[in-house]
């Protein structure tokens, strides 16, 4: 239900901000790279915010509500973190919406060829959950407000994930490519994380190789 999604995300944030104002509390909330749609990369806060699906639009609505609140209440700190493609322990409950790292791992662990949209060169800015946690802790510590991209600043392909998994699992499985069935699909996402670096002191610690290697310890 698209309208329910818009209401839940936008209205819930309004209610939370009312409580934040009453309690003079600091708020850190989850935004999303979905606000950028298929805008050119590297994606920067305040530029190319043209979502192409209801989820991305609902997150952009949240960001605009938050920015208005920040302007009206500069003494209260509010931070929105725009997560890019997060992967890591604790996502299995998400099923088909879990990360591509998890989906491909499951297929390959079972000895199946990993299925990818043709030709696997779609690129994403994959960020490991431990870097996301660090970003939240930094946002708690810093006396700043704003919207920040949380990613690695590097775009990697789905084919590269398969290659890394083959190496770590000791397999040699070739991708099974098929046509993308979606009218809208983000073919390339890459964040500019300059703002998070400068104002939060955020610096990603895990490359895709390092993140997947650590992730496999938990699977």
What are these language model-derived features?
Residues 5-6:
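A hydrophobic alpha-helix adjacent to the NAD(P)-binding/active-site core of NAD(P)-dependent oxidoreductases
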Residues 13-14, 60-67, 101-105, 134:
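Conserved active-site helix of classical SDR/Rossmann-fold NAD(P)-dependent CH-OH oxidoreductases
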Residues 14-54, 79:
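Conserved Rossmann-fold NAD(P)-dependent oxidoreductase catalytic core, especially the SDR/UDP-sugar
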Residues 35-36, 86-88, 132:
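Conserved sequence/active-site signature of Rossmann-fold short-chain dehydrogenase/reductase
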Residues 38-39, 50-79, 84, 108-110:
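Active-site Tyr-X1-5-Lys
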Residues 51-58, 83, 93, 97-101, ...:
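The catalytic Tyr-centered alpha-helix of NAD(P)H-dependent dehydrogenases
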Residues 108-219:
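C-terminal substrate-binding subdomain of Rossmann-fold SDR/epimerase-dehydratase oxidoreductases
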């Amino acid at each position: 239900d698209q309208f329910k999604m818009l209401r839940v995300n936008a209205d819930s944030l309004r209610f939370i901000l009312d409580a934040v104002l009453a309690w003079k509390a600091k708020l850190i909330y989850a935004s999303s790279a979905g606000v950028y749609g298929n805008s050119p990369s590297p994606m920067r806060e305040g530029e190319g915010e043209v979502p192409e699906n209801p989820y991305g639009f609902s997150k952009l609505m949240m960001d605009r509500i938050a920015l208005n609140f920040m302007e009206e209440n500069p003494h209260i700190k509010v931070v929105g973190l725009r997560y890019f493609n997060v992967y890591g322990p604790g996502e299995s409950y998400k099923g088909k919406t879990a990360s591509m790292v998890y989906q491909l791992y499951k297929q390959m662990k079972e000895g199946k060829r990993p299925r990818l949209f043709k030709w696997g060169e779609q690129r994403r800015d994959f960020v490991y959950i431990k870097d996301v946690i660090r970003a939240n802790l930094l946002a708690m510590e810093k006396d700043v407000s704003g919207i920040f991209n949380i990613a690695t600043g590097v775009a990697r392909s789905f084919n590269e994930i398969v290659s890394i998994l083959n190496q770590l699992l000791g397999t040699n499985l070739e991708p099974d490519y098929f046509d993308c069935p979606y009218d809208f699909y983000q073919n390339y996402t890459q964040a500019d994380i300059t703002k998070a670096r400068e104002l939060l002191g955020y610096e990603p610690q895990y490359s895709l190789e390092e993140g997947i290697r650590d992730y496999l310890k938990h699977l």
